């Protein structure tokens, strides 16, 4: 069991994953380093061949997009290994957000975010990481919408966007994402409020591998499936939510894409996620106890 004192000690986390940095410092490289990796610095190059016009057409029609082979494999492999180390240590995968590299993944996606949200981008304090293990009946989150309010104005002005990044292969066998495309739901008599409202033939599976980036309007109905015990590997993934900062804040505090939170701020934010998402994710009493202790100061 991890103590509150350990949780508050950045060196404890650096020791668990010495190849990753916290606020520019890692256990394997104690000197302060530049927190911007090559992936973040070369963000524009990641989308050099992306057809943003076709991407927009699909997004505004169906409510989501899926791009393959965008993010650098080396960065994703290090994050996947770090989450596997957290799991092996009996710690939740969401603790990966203590490390700089988890934030750098999304910083590298600025050109994509700018295309949909404009230049004024804010990170919402809503994020999670999954390790869907087929050995214990693991599953993604049940059907839901990330935000129940207005996610866009008309068909050309987006208010908020969710991004989802697989660190491993995400397949129908190990729990890939599923969506109800808006192009189908808009013909329903009323918006879907429960899974039974969905016409099964309208459901779309979205298998994806490391390097892919998936995004959807926050009012898109979506879920992660349950893994088969015959799946060969777990589904490991990250998500983070964003908004156009020109609109009223959809969360508090709004975060800066270019300046990740400090270690103490990250710890508080992560503890808040466990409280926020306890209705979506099974959590043990020990995890909730140290989260509540951190939130109380």
List each language-model region with its residue ranges:
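A structural signal for short, well-ordered beta-strand segments
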Residues: 126-128, 163-165, 238-242
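Short, solvent-exposed loop/turn segments at secondary-structure junctions
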Residues: 71-73, 129-134, 148, 170-172, ...
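Short hydrophobic-aromatic micro-motifs
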Residues: 66-67, 163, 214-216
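Conserved metal-binding segment of the jelly-roll/cupin
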Residues: 208-223
């Amino acid at each position: 069991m991890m103590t509150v004192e350990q949780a508050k000690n950045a060196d404890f986390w650096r020791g668990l994953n010495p190849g990753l940095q916290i606020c520019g410092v890692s256990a394997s490289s104690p000197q302060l380093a530049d927190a911007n990796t090559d992936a973040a610095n070369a963000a524009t190059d990641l989308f050099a061949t992306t057809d943003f016009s076709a991407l927009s057409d699909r997004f505004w029609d169906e409510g989501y997009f899926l791009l393959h082979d965008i993010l650098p494999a080396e960065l994703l492999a290090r994050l996947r290994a770090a989450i596997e180390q957290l799991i092996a240590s009996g710690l939740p995968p969401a603790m990966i957000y203590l490390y700089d590299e988890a934030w750098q993944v999304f910083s590298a996606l600025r050109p994509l975010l700018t295309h949909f949200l404009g230049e004024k981008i804010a990170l919402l304090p809503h994020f999670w990481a999954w390790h869907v293990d087929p050995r214990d009946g693991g599953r993604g989150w049940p059907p839901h919408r990330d935000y129940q309010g207005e996610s866009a104005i008309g068909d050309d002005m987006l208010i908020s966007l969710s991004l989802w990044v697989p660190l491993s292969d995400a397949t129908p066998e190990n729990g890939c994402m599923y969506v109800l495309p808006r192009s189908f739901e808009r013909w329903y008599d009323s918006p879907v409020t429960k899974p039974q409202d969905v016409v099964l033939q309208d459901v779309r599976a979205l298998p994806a591998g490391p390097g892919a980036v998936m995004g959807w309007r926050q009012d898109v109905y979506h879920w992660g499936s349950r893994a088969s015990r015959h799946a060969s590997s777990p589904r490991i993934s990250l998500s983070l939510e964003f908004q156009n900062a020109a609109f009223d804040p959809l969360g508090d505090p709004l975060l800066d894409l270019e300046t990740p939170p400090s270690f103490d701020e990250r710890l508080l934010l992560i503890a808040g996620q466990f409280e926020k998402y306890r209705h979506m994710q099974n959590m043990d009493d020990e995890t909730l106890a140290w989260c509540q202790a951190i939130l109380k100061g």
